[in-house]
């Protein structure tokens, strides 16, 4: 089984804590993109990324500092900050669970393409959906092609917990029968009907990834047993390849670390 999540806009230069870091599989492509981003002035970044002038200046500084110097890198999974990662709570996992996550969990990224949890990275800002100036980078989907998908094992189940914007670098290139894309809904207290709540779903994706890791779930049948932060499997709403989990009362309160960015 391979578990896919995606990167976050908010990042930090996380401490290494003595963890040995690995080299991202597509680092050469990341260097190419970063070198190009460094040529764009703050005003252009503001336009392309829809940023305020102040944030564009900050982003320009972050990009200018980006490099591949080994002792400047941080573990990818500790570098991203956001709802998915607050649900994942990687820092609370045992050493054995972290090793398992490093084997089974992959992070889809606009700059790096795909990352293992303990690949070494530097902070950056580049969402997969951005359309950069210049014909080669207008579409990052064209830039990456099938390179990201080729980093995923050719057989076995793929649990897709990534946003569509990111999973598009993988899903068109693999057999649809391999994909399981869970959906997370919260019951609306007013209508009594399940609905999609963005922040809840993001935290649930992280919690689901954590659960898969700690329980060592490796078959589609076991996925239905997920029962964390208030969610339960809904057999009626589910369909092949898309199990649906519904919570009456969201149990992930206090986990979100959404930031202004």
Placement of each model-derived feature along the sequence:
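Internal, well-folded beta-alpha domain core
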Residues: 90-255, 261
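Near-N-terminal "mature-domain entry" segment
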Residues: 1-126
């Amino acid at each position: 089984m391979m578990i896919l999540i995606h990167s976050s806009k908010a990042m930090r230069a996380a401490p290494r804590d003595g963890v040995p870091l690995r080299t991202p599989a597509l680092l050469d492509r990341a260097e190419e993109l970063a070198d190009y981003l460094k040529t764009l002035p703050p005003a252009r970044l503001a336009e392309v990324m829809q940023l305020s002038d102040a944030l564009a200046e900050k982003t320009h500084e972050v990009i200018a500092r980006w490099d591949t110097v080994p002792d400047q890198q941080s573990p990818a999974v500790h570098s991203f900050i956001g709802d998915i990662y607050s649900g994942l709570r990687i820092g609370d996992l045992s050493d054995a669970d972290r090793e398992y996550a490093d084997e089974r969990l992959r992070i889809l990224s606009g700059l790096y393409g795909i990352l293992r949890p303990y690949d070494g990275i530097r902070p950056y800002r580049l969402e997969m959906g951005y359309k950069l100036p210049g014909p080669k980078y207008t579409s990052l989907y064209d830039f990456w092609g099938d390179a990201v998908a080729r980093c995923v094992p050719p057989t076995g189940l793929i649990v897709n917990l990534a946003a569509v914007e990111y999973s598009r670098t993988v899903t068109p290139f693999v057999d649809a029968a391999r994909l399981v894309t869970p959906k997370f809904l919260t019951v609306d207290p007013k209508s009594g009907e399940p609905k999609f709540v963005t922040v809840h779903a993001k935290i649930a994706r992280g919690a689901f990834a954590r659960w898969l890791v700690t329980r060592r779930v490796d078959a589609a049948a076991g996925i239905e047993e997920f029962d964390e932060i208030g969610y339960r499997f809904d057999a009626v709403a589910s369909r092949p390849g898309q199990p649906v989990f519904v919570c009456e009362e969201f149990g992930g309160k206090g986990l979100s670390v959404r930031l202004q960015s």
